[in-house]
């Protein structure tokens, strides 16, 4: 590692380019301990290693005695301790709670430290001050944010098939607007997107899905009325066609509202998930249909990394967000950084995002890993003669900070820090 570059990257004020952080009272309502910090992602590795669903649920339940949970947790922890998910927790334990090694002697005193630090201001202490984060792009689907420098990314799709009527009733109540047909729902969508702007939203979030055929407004209006009347529209894939139509309309609204479309691509949290349905190349028809919209494609498209790099290189309306990928597979992240640095324009990349809901401490760990990985990868580019030191330093500044202001331009209107 080039020490000078490493020190620069570690000290740099940076953007946390993807979180789901809830308002702090959600974290403060829990009595956290050392095992609970593994609940969001590392618990998936425990399950993958063979822990039963029942034991995993018990191990992550703070209401169960810590001693019992440790007995369940410890054997499987030995199998997962070197995965990226566990490394993020271990980094947080070391830097924030003074625990160099989690074992029979340290789990109880470390848990006491974690509980004692679970106080108001925890997000700013761990991410803002200790983590040197100056801006958070936060997809908690709420207007309420945990810190003043966190800005909401909200829902692109207002309706989906599984909860159609419940969601519609919620929107009608929230906005005091009665929906009777497709035209009136499209009018409601416009009202909602204006509300997004009033509440400092900087982007809208969707998930990559297999492309559906295109239908016209007349056909969509017929489907809408049938669904509204709790009837199934005729045709095997009609629901997918209808919701694809609505998604296209939402993307058009996002473009007109200057909201970036953030897209989950690739790997899914959990176990036994079919993540092929969210493959990054499924996005290509949408990217072509909406050249005026901005798409920030998440998670390096893992495991389809080369495809993600190719899409970012080939499409003028795409940026590539490496959030979470540095936790899923740290080594793959570093290999990708080296490839991206020499293939994708430097203004199209966001380097990291913690991607947690109630775990600003674990996000700190994931972001610290990302900085170290970025430093190693760019040091390799210097060593190989592909980048000079000054070029690598400039690249890290763009990826970690300044690119966020062009990829999410609404941030410029609200951010309490200067570009």
Where are these regions (language model features)?
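Conserved, mostly hydrophobic/aromatic
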Residues: 18, 136, 204, 254, ...
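Active-site gating/metal-coordination segments in enzymes
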Residues: 92-260, 269
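Active-site-proximal loop/turn and secondary-structure-junction residues that shape catalytic pockets
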Residues: 142, 158, 208-210, 267-269, ...
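Mid-to-C-terminal alpha-helical segments outside catalytic/metal-binding sites
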Residues: 1-15, 35-94, 346-348, 364-419
């Amino acid at each position: 590692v080039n020490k000078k570059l490493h020190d620069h990257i570690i000290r740099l004020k940076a953007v946390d380019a993807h979180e789901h952080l809830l308002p702090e009272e959600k974290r403060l309502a829990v009595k956290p301990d050392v095992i609970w910090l593994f609940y969001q992602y590392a618990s998936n590795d425990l399950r993958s290693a063979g822990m039963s669903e029942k034991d995993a649920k018990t191990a992550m339940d703070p209401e169960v005695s810590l001693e019992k949970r440790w007995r369940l947790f410890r054997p499987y922890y030995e199998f997962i301790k070197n995965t990226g998910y566990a490394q993020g927790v271990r980094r947080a334990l070391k830097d924030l709670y003074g625990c160099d090694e989690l074992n029979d002697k340290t789990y109880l005193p470390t848990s006491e430290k974690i509980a004692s630090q679970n106080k108001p201001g925890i997000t700013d202490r761990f991410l803002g001050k200790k983590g040197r984060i100056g801006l958070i792009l936060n997809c908690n689907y709420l207007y309420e944010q945990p810190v003043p420098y966190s800005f909401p990314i909200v829902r692109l799709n207002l309706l989906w098939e599984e909860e159609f009527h419940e969601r519609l009733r919620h929107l009608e109540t929230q906005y005091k607007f009665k929906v009777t047909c497709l035209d009136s729902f499209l009018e409601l969508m416009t009202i909602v997107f204006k509300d997004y702007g009033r509440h400092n939203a900087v982007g809208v979030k969707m998930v990559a899905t297999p492309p559906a055929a295109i239908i016209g407004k007349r056909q969509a209006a017929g489907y809408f009325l049938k669904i509204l009347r709790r009837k199934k529209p005729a045709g095997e894939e009609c629901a997918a066609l209808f919701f694809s139509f609505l998604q296209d309309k939402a993307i058009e609204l996002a473009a007109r509202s200057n909201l970036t479309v953030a897209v989950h691509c690739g790997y899914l949290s959990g176990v036994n998930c079919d993540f092929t349905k969210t493959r990054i190349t499924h996005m290509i028809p949408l990217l072509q249909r909406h050249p005026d919209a901005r798409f920030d494609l998440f998670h390096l498209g893992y495991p389809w990394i080369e495809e993600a790099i190719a899409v970012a290189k080939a499409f003028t309306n795409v940026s590539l967000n490496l959030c979470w990928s540095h936790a899923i597979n740290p080594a793959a992240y570093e290999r990708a950084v080296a490839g991206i640095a020499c293939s994708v324009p430097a203004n199209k990349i966001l380097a990291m995002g913690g991607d947690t809901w109630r775990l600003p401490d674990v996000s700190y760990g994931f972001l610290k890993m990302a900085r170290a990985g970025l430093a190693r990868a760019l040091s390799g580019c210097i060593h190989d003669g592909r980048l000079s030191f000054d070029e690598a330093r400039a690249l890290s500044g763009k990826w970690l900070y300044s690119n966020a202001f062009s990829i999410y331009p609404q941030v410029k209107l609200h951010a309490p820090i200067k570009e």
